[in-house]
């Protein structure tokens, strides 16, 4: 007999009432969970302002002796006010729960950025690290040690501004020279003096920033091993390797922060004087496409550099090299298109490895024999943080004459022509990327492009007009519009039709299946997750491990099996 899906949110009311402030919040979509708390998007019913509602169960809090810790977290966090710290708006309680009203960070945390991208460019790292330092400097100036700085506690808002959050382990230094003795932190980021219990202070945050910076640039934490024992051993010995491809300014800064002796580490304010930050202009913004794809060019790169950069293994895109760009480049009117080397595109082996990984993950899911449920799993089994950033919302097949056209969820338009060349119109409706048969990228605008592409540009306009006028958009609407010149949007790598579905593989690694019954699947190998979109355009994202552990509806299971079979055929084609 099929099992019923569980819904564990019954102890949380739909309306959260703050009697003292005379405010009522409506509980909206589930946002995530961790420790003893669940997080929801909540709306102030009077003002329509949207917040994150962190809801802590009193029953669990008392059971695990977390009452004092929660009180200290609230006391510290409510006293803070800085652009790079998650804003604390309010807190209240009832007989069942404590409700903490926080700034909503819709772009999730830097952990999701890391999973999707592995390594990021130095250009991007400079942007993030500078903001992290600003936030931590504010904390240290106010005698607060965070003690749990890690990618998962560094949140991102819609503008990709860094917001430091989760003050559950934070502490305040009461007097000059005080050393804390509590064993706390996250294994991959914990400082050696915490492990040796010699007493610790502000320097533990510097160590953690070093681990964060290393992870962003290299793609994995510096001391990561398969076991906790080995990781702690490496941390105590300060045993890690700086890859040779890291440029000296970046390597010097990481090495300075990862000093085994806390007294040898720079103070937070001194980090701003390192060449990595001082020698290059810190970017003022990044496009949201950087969450899944490397930027096309950094404003400190030269035109020549953008044409000849070498890819870093496991990096989704590019890494700046030693040379620099005149700051006027991005402002210049590009009369001649800038052609980037095929090296900036991910190689076909990388696309294949994504499909191989996805096929293996689906195979493991099926072999796990998940129980079949009568309906979908409850909201609390979903993982909204793993929801795809880009998917295909419209498509039209004119491959009998011209090619396959599609629109991404952010309003970007793409065409894959029958000769395998591609045109992508960015959401700003100005910038155009052309990708030739060999994978070389050419950057143009709708008014300034190669005359040899005249016919294809007209076809792009035709596809765009048809989809806008005749097709209904699939999926959520809350997607930012890209409007800058450094975006590299994911585009269609390959597609094919079957008797009951259209299968589309994007260059960010995801595979989308649009079924004839109007159900859609988006599979992401990097997040190990599947997103299921029903006829009403409702999104549900599940980790593969959650499905194995908790079960799956019959319809979704059948579609997963179908997707696995199509991935197998894709792999066979790639190897022939």
Curated annotation (Swiss-Prot):
Domain POLO box: 391-469, 491-572
Database matches in SUPFAM superfamilies: Polo-box domain, Protein kinase-like (PK-like)
Residues holding ATP: 31-39, 54
Domain named Protein kinase: residues: 25-277
Positions where Phosphoserine occurs in the chain: 299, 306, 327
Free-text tissue specificity from the UniProt record: Larval disks, brain and testis.
Record-listed Phosphothreonine modification sites: 182, 186, 302, 323, 328
One family name in Pfam for this protein: POLO_box
Molecular function as annotated in GO: ATP binding; protein kinase activity; protein serine kinase activity; protein serine/threonine kinase activity
Domain of life: Eukaryota
Protein name: Serine/threonine-protein kinase polo
Organism: Drosophila melanogaster (Fruit fly)
Gene giving rise to this polypeptide: polo
């Amino acid at each position: 007999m099929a099992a019923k899906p569980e819904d564990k949110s019954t102890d949380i009311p739909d309306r959260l009432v703050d009697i003292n402030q005379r405010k009522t919040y409506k509980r909206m979509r589930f946002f995530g969970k961790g420790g003893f708390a669940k997080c929801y998007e909540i709306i102030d019913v009077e003002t329509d302002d949207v917040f994150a509602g962190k809801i802590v169960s009193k029953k669990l809090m008392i059971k695990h002796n977390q009452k004092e810790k929660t009180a200290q977290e609230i006391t510290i966090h409510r006293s803070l006010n800085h652009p790079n710290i998650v804003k604390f708006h309010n807190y209240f309680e009832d007989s069942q729960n404590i409700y903490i009203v926080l700034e909503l960070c819709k772009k999730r945390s830097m952990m999701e950025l890391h999973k999707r991208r592995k390594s990021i460019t130095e250009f991007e790292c400079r942007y993030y690290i500078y903001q992290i330092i600003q936030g931590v400097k504010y904390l240290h100036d106010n005698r607060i040690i965070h003690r749990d700085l890690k990618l998962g506690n560094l949140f991102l808002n819609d503008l990709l501004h860094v917001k430091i959050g989760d003050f559950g382990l934070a502490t305040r230094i009461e007097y000059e020279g005080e050393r804390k003795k509590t064993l706390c932190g996250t294994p991959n980021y914990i400082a050696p003096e915490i492990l040796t219990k010699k007493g610790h202070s502000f320097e533990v945050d510097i160590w953690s920033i070093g681990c964060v910076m290393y992870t962003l640039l290299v793609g994995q934490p510096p001391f990561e091993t398969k076991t906790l024992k080995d990781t702690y051993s490496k941390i105590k010995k300060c045993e890690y390797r700086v890859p040779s491809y890291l440029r000296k300014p970046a390597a010097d800064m990481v090495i300075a922060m990862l000093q085994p002796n806390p007294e040898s580490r720079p103070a937070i304010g001194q980090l701003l004087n390192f060449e990595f930050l001082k020698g290059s202009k810190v970017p003022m913004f990044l496009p949201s496409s950087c969450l899944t794809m490397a930027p096309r060019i950094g404003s400190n790169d030269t035109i020549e550099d953008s044409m000849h950069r070498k890819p870093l293994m496991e990096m989704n895109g590019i890494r700046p090299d030693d040379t620099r760009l005149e700051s006027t480049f991005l402002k210049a009117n590009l009369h001649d298109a800038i052609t980037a080397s095929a090296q900036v595109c991910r190689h076909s082996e990388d696309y294949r490895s994504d499909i191989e990984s996805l096929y293996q993950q689906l195979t493991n899911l099926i072999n796990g024999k998940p129980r079949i449920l009568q309906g979908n799993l409850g909201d609390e089994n979903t993982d909204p943080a793993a929801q795809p950033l880009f998917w295909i919302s419209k498509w039209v097949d004119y491959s009998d004459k011209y090619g396959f056209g599609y629109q991404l969820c952010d309003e970007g338009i793409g065409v894959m022509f029958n000769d395998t060349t591609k045109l992508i119109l960015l959401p700003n409706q100005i910038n155009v990327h052309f990708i030739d048969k060999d994978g070389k990228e050419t950057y143009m605008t709708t008014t300034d492009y190669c005359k040899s592409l005249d016919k294809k540009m007209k076809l792009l306009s035709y596809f765009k007009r048809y989809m806008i006028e005749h097709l209904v958009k699939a999926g959520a609407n809350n997607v930012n519009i890209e409007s800058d010149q450094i975006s590299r949007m994911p585009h269609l790598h390959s597609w094919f039709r079957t008797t009951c579905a259209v299968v589309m593989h994007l260059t960010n690694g995801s595979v989308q299946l649009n079924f004839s019954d109007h159900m859609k699947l988006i599979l992401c190998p990097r997040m190990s997750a599947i997103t299921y979109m029903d006829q009403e355009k409702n999104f549900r994202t599940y980790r593969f491990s959650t499905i194995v552990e908790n079960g799956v509806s019959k319809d979704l299971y059948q579609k997963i099996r179908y997707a696995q079979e199509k991935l197998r055929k894709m792999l066979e084609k790639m190897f022939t």
